[in-house]
């Protein structure tokens, strides 16, 4: 499945449960765009009162010019790594938007155009840790869309990875790129 984004302003929502790392993924994506690709980007986040298990989302807007409204109006891309997130946010996806779901966590998708990949399983197979699923997700997202350069996301992941885990996180990112290439039939 080849993915094209038509808008100059790209609105991305990464949503799941607390502890799945979607907020960190949003921060890394925004840093890749703003710091390493010299694009304008803004990142916002919200989460429930629970430290783990409650709903959480990160929104990233990337554009060539000034970003005058810092929230997603209608998502170009929705990444849903929990059923609750998919159910809650899929209706706010643009008609031609891209829905990426973790098939390990999301059983019901509202469209046959969804890109369904076993993200958590890929993370465990690659790094032995489900916590790296957020970085696998970034590889898939960037690999499918090209919203930031591969070099930018690699630098941003390496900069945010806890000391001593850079190699593991870059392996998770690479796994995401491989999954995106397979989804694109390349």
In which residue ranges do the predicted regions lie?
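Active-site cofactor/cluster-binding pocket
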Residues: 2-186
């Amino acid at each position: 499945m080849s993915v094209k984004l038509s808008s100059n302003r790209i609105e991305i929502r990464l949503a799941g449960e607390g502890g799945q790392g979607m907020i960190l993924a949003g921060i890394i994506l925004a840093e890749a765009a703003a710091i390493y690709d010299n694009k304008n980007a803004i990142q916002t986040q919200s989460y429930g009162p629970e430290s783990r298990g409650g709903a959480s989302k990160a929104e990233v807007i990337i554009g060539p010019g000034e970003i005058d409204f810092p929230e997603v109006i209608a998502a170009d891309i929705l990444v849903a790594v929990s059923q609750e997130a998919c159910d809650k946010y899929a209706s706010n996806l643009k008609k031609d938007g891209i829905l990426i779901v973790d098939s390990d966590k999301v059983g019901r998708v509202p469209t046959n155009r969804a890109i369904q990949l076993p993200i958590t399983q890929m993370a465990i197979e690659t790094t032995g840790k489900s916590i790296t699923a957020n970085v696998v997700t970034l590889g898939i997202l960037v690999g499918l869309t090209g919203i930031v350069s591969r070099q930018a996301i690699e630098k941003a992941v390496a900069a945010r990875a806890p000391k001593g885990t850079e190699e593991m996180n870059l392996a998770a990112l690479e796994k995401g790129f491989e999954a995106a290439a397979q989804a694109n039939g390349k």
